[in-house]
From Swiss-Prot:
Retrotransposons are mobile genetic entities that are able to replicate via an RNA intermediate and a reverse transcription step. In contrast to retroviruses, retrotransposons are non-infectious, lack an envelope and remain intracellular. Ty1 retrotransposons belong to the copia elements (pseudoviridae). Residues 153-165, 402-418 have a biased composition (Low complexity). One of its GO terms (molecular function) is RNA binding. The keyword RNA-binding applies. Pfam families: TYA. Capsid protein (CA) is the structural component of the virus-like particle (VLP), forming the shell that encapsulates the retrotransposons dimeric RNA genome. The particles are assembled from trimer-clustered units and there are holes in the capsid shells that allow for the diffusion of macromolecules. CA also has nucleocapsid-like chaperone activity, promoting primer tRNA(i)-Met annealing to the multipartite primer-binding site (PBS), dimerization of Ty1 RNA and initiation of reverse transcription. This is Transposon Ty1-DR6 Gag polyprotein. It comes from Saccharomyces cerevisiae (strain ATCC 204508 / S288c).
Length: 440
């Protein structure tokens, strides 16, 4: 009986099962595969306990405290019930969580370099990466957002979260430096506009078009704290958040004011560098324009001293004002006020000379009348020349006949003949010609 059992449990039939038995167990008569049920249950309990300890072990790294945000846990954004923007344009809980890729599709399909987020917004456990726009690539506001034609058909979770419109909003880049905040806030405002939240953005006067709702304020706060870590915020932004950590609207309003101020500064600098004056406009208006530009720049921290201002003004002078460039004896200590005194003096001299100069120019109407009268008077003269010629020709014939008859007549006085022949014949023509009898 034992031989049959040994033949059944031979190494040939059992292979690796018998090979794993130690040499100590081979000398015993106990079957190596005969394991009691109690030992099996103990092993199962031990393995279950080990697995439970691994899953419940807390993370080794503690989450640092965030002094400017409400909670380091991932933001929970309740979906709006009757919000002004559609459901697909608002982040859900998975979309606001950096570990959820359902809104953007698979990470490998994102055409941007992934970036590890700051741990202050990460919950303990497995973490994933979030897209970042590197500084070398940049995201200009003129670049259209990939809201259309960028569908991810391979992701089933994206289909469940989005509607049939298949529109995706491009997220803003991660803020990585306080100096990059002015450029970052431009992309964040663009992100809000693409999410149908342009009405809550403050306008030029600092007021939004409509009132923000509670759901929109939650969305605004959550997205701001995700994409703008507190350690990279400027000092003035931290001061606002220290008073009210949810006052994102005030941050946006101050940012827009700074953008307008920067734009005005750039325009003033360009205008001051391209000044042109030749006396065509009043000197008072030119002085007011220049002094206002200099005052605005000085108030915004861009100081323009008298030397630089005078050089910029004199470089744009032309005409009679151009010689002010060569007044070297006053260039060192000349002020803007002194330079404008010289400009006013030249302008007043120009105006006085223009007012005192007599006007010798004839009126155009008089010239037209003279030309018309000249044509009218010359016309009858041309017409009257023909009858004069005929009368002269007749008189010539008559005089010649009289001379010939007088020569034949014996009673004619020779002295009178010679006197008449030497007398010039007066012709009534235009050129006033004097013809003698021998010439015709």
């Amino acid at each position: 009986m034992e031989s049959q059992q040994l033949s059944q449990h031979s190494p040939i039939s059992h292979g690796s099962a018998c090979a794993s038995v130690t040499s100590k167990e081979v000398h015993t008569n106990q079957d190596p595969l005969d394991v009691s049920a109690s030992k099996t249950e103990e092993c199962e309990k031990a393995s279950t306990k080990a697995n439970s300890q691994q899953t419940t072990t807390p993370a080794s790294s503690a989450v640092p405290e965030n002094p400017h945000h409400a909670s380091p846990q991932p933001a929970s954004v309740p979906p709006p019930q009757n919000g002004p923007y559609p459901q697909q344009c608002m982040m859900t809980q998975n979309q606001a969580n950096p570990s959820g890729w359902s809104f953007y599709g698979h990470p490998s399909m994102i055409p941007y370099t992934p970036y590890q987020m700051s741990p202050m917004y990460f919950p303990p456990g497995p973490q994933s990466q979030f897209p970042q726009y590197p500084s070398s690539v940049g995201t200009p506001l003129s670049t259209p957002s990939p809201e259309s034609g960028n569908t991810f058909t391979d992701s089933s979770s994206a289909d469940s979260d989005m509607t049939s419109t298949k529109k995706y909003v491009r997220p803003p880049p991660m803020l990585t430096s306080p100096n990059d905040f002015p450029n970052w806030v431009k992309t964040y405002i663009k992100f809000l506009q693409n999410s149908n939240l342009g009405g809550i953005i403050p306008t030029v006067n600092g007021k939004p078009v409509r009132q923000i709702t509670d759901d929109e304020l939650t969305f605004l706060y959550n997205t701001f704290q995700i994409f703008a870590p507190s350690q990279f915020l400027p000092t003035w932004v931290k001061d606002i958040l220290s008073v009210d950590y949810t006052d994102i609207m005030k941050i946006l309003s101050k940012s827009i004011e700074k953008m307008q101020s920067d734009t005005q500064e750039a325009n003033d600098i360009v205008t001051l560098a391209n000044l042109q004056y030749n006396g065509s406009t009043p000197a008072d208006a030119f002085e007011t324009k220049v002094t206002n530009i200099i005052d605005r720049l000085n108030n915004n921290g861009i100081h323009i001293n008298n030397k630089v201002a005078c050089q910029l003004i004199m470089r744009g002078l032309s005409g009679e004002y151009k010689f002010l460039r060569y007044t070297r004896h006053r260039h060192l200590n000349m002020t803007v006020a002194e330079l404008f005194l010289d400009i006013h003096a030249i302008y007043e001299e120009q105006q006085g000379s223009r007012n005192s100069k007599p006007n010798y120019r004839r009126n155009l109407s008089d010239e037209k009348n003279d030309s018309r009268s000249y044509t009218n008077t010359t016309k009858p003269k041309v017409i009257a020349r023909n009858p004069q010629k005929t009368n002269n020709s007749k008189s010539k014939t008559a005089r010649a006949h009289n001379v010939s008859t007088s020569n034949n007549s014996p009673s004619t006085d020779n002295d009178s003949i010679s006197k008449s022949t030497t007398e010039p014949i007066q012709l009534n023509n235009k050129h006033d010609l004097h013809l003698r009898p021998g010439t015709y």
